[in-house]
Amino acid sequence: MIVKNASKAVAALAATLTLTTLLGCAHPAGSQAEANYVDIGLIAFNDFHGNLEPPHIAVPIRSQRGVERVPAGGAAYLASAIAQLKARHPHHAVITAGDMVSASPLVSALFLDEPTIEAVNHMQIDFSAVGNHEFDRGWQELLRLQQGGCEKFTVREPCQISKPFEGAKFRFLAANTVREDGQPLLPATGIKRFTQGNATVAVGFIGMTLKATPTMVSPAGVKGLRFEDEAATANALVPQLRAQGADVIVVAIHEGGYTDAKVLEQECSGINGDIVPILERLDPSVDVVVSGHTHQAYVCDYGRINPARPFLLTSAGQYGALLTEVSLRVDTATRQVVRKTAHNHIVQGEAFTGSQGLVPLNAAVPAYPADPFVQQLVARYKAAAEPLAQRPVGRASAPLLRVRNEALESALGNLVADAQLLATRAPEDGGAQLSFMNPGGLRADLVPDEQGLVRYGQLYAVQPFGNQLVIKTFTGAQIRAVLEQQFASGGNTVQRPRVLSVSSGFSYRYDLSQPAGARISHMVLNGAPVTDLQSVRVVMSSFLDSGGDNFTVLTQGQDRRVGELDLDALEAYFRLQSPVAPPATNRITRVVPAAR
């Protein structure tokens, strides 16, 4: 049975029943039939992003009572879930598909994600593909996370709690990340062998990030590296793994897709995204592709889309809320996988109260006890971060959310853009007139407590990257070109646009029915039309300043000036403007032509 997303109770129950049936039908120990096969379990997750504490994610499930919500995630519960799945599969491997660290909540990020590495060490995983966020603090810091030590590569101090920091006991894999001299930054592959009786089966793993990683991180973080084509890299490594005895090939890749298949449909209907062209060129002898990056949850039999490439394609969403279980049966005579199934399981955590009210534990979904070691580890780091995390910074009159309207504008994005403008508007601070904020830089919603208080840890969760503000002068024509790049630059397309938030006082319209270069109109700044020759001072993050998210025009501009950290600007905004109300989402208008 192939289940797309067990974030539905029916899927979770079906997964449990399937496993029970398989175990119940196992051949008696020592039988000839059993001796011909080795059963292997793969356990996978992705995009954990240092969410050590339960991330207050509510996974929707369907029941006889309608749609219910299940609280999911938390490292202590994830560790327990992994342990239970390991117990089901005597032969097992645990892997991740990248973005284990960075863009993390304060309890991990304040300590350079060392606590996340320590928690995952306790889970005893085997391999982790690198993702783009592993490079946020630079490749040298990534190597420190692997190797351990206290050498300082960032503005934050390493080894604040663990002295010394031992590093990852699992292996990061970075097959398509190569130094200028052609040497790999990290290992490309790994092999794990399983012996049963006289038979040994080897599983080969290829791990890699997406080729577009340099467009998503600071150029300084990947200086001296190149990121090669994903499919070509994997295809070149498959015969090498075969030569080393690998019977099964698993690709863990930090790239993903989207699918609109119903929860119990055993197909990949509507699958799209950047993973698809990679799959279409991938060696068909690959057995499983564990993906990530899009934060989507799916389990797909890709062979139903393209019979020539019968991969299992999986992704476990984000933040440790889901865990993927893959079951493989290998014929020891032919060395072939003769059966493979996959399921996503909800990692039910603990009840919480969010912007939509109480999310209680759900008896229809398996619950996991908190792993005591991980629970104590998280508590130790939380106590160290608590004074800073709990410091009040201001008030909000209502939740500030990333939910986007039809024009892809959000209240939280507008607020952050306004905060950047306020911090740099004065002539002595850069003289900014307009602010841009990329949606990917907003990592959490901002929900005040019952008294309306907002705390520093919440601001950090929204903007955890530590970008500096950069102010430059652009012409009106360049600003128009920037906005055009929302729909036609690299991965920014009409099908998957990346719409920037803009500050108060600026507005424009876009029409996706028009050709590229003619989609932006009616640009207005402070009540006056923006002309092509007009000069405008624009503030943005250092990430956008370096051309991040495919906004290459933003690398241009004149009279560059560097301001304060984005997080400091947001904190100052709350200090000066409290109580803060959600800004209106009426700055951007999407023009939809009338049907003929």
Describe every region a protein language model picked out.
Residues 36-41, 51, 160-191, 302-312, ...:
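Feature captures C-terminal
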